[in-house]
Amino acid sequence: MATIYYDSDADLAYLAGKTVAVLGYGSQGHAHAQNLRDSGVQVVVGLHEGSRSRERAKSDGFEVLTPREAAARGDIISMLMPDHVQKGVYEESVAPELRPGKLLMFAHGFNIHYGRIVPPPDVDVAMVAPKSPGHILRDLYVQGIGVPALVAVHQDASGQAKQIALAYAKGLGCTKAGVIETTFKEETETDLFGEQAVLCGGVSHLIQAGFETLVEAGYQPEVAYFEVLNELKLIVDLIYEGGLKFMRYSVSDTAEYGDYVSGPKVIDDHVRETMHKLLQDIQTGRFAQQWIAENEAGRPNFYRMRQEHLQHPIEEVGDRLRAMMPWLKRREIPS
């Protein structure tokens, strides 16, 4: 049974007199900085001189420093830039400014778990991982609700790392919803598996395969799009609201019966075995090594695969059909 912490389990007094240096001002960074500040915590933002986020952070009222200046100022240093750049930022800007008693904070365990970043033993290392995009974390904080989060401690040099991490989570508003205790290992491996097998890799390729199957059988691409992609949101919303049981309760009996008899034919033993292999690649660090090598080589395969999928026929069909839906906000992807 999971250990879950709430407002009464966390004390913002553990952040009193401390400065949080938020390094990065993207999806998570802006929300962490604003929520902590609005909870009464002293916050500075660390961004490189050429960062496009500097003006945004300044307009939000923050003192913006270089990453190294912010790391020097911070008692708690939050590493909220993308995984693949964290090691470089740590070595160049953070490691030289670490002192006994400081706490290094993460929102994802990748670089600690896979040994990309190895902090000295006299600093605390913790993680608070809100389970939502940053804009939702911020919006729900403003509404006084909060989103669930995970909390973990990797090093407890001070003897207070857990209390400080829970205070940080409370400053984000997460203890209003509940904060689940975990480890860096568990968070990293389950997060990567979820992305690869279900949320991103699994769903996107299932959609494309369903679309291709219908179109190859002679059905109109527009109709195929609605059946395998557009209606997915309706189903996911039902699952999100009440679990698989609520989705099955809400759909037609025909759809529910098809779920039971045909679902196991799609997600069969071969697929489950493949999932186990994906998990093994994550657990052994094989995937991490592959992703690190891809970045060090300049991402040639990553960019090639991105372009290939952008050219999939489902994208052109989707662009045309979404133009028929004026209630949707137009989303432009930077080139």
UniProtKB/Swiss-Prot annotation:
Binding site for Mg(2+) 2: 191, 227, 231
Metabolic or biological pathway: Amino-acid biosynthesis; L-isoleucine biosynthesis; L-isoleucine from 2-oxobutanoate: step 2/4; Amino-acid biosynthesis; L-valine biosynthesis; L-valine from pyruvate: step 2/4
Binding site for Mg(2+) 1: 191, 195
Active site: 108
Domain of life: Bacteria
InterPro entries in the record: 6-PGluconate_DH-like_C_sf, KARI, KARI_C, KARI_N, KARI_prok, NAD(P)-bd_dom_sf
Keywords from the named record: Amino-acid biosynthesis, Branched-chain amino acid biosynthesis, Magnesium, Metal-binding, NADP, Oxidoreductase
Obligatory cofactor(s): Mg(2+)
Domain KARI N-terminal Rossmann, residue spans: 1-182
PANTHER family documented for this protein: KETOL-ACID REDUCTOISOMERASE, MITOCHONDRIAL (PTHR21371:SF1)
Record HAMAP family: IlvC
Protein name, per record: Ketol-acid reductoisomerase (NADP(+))
Gene for this chain: ilvC
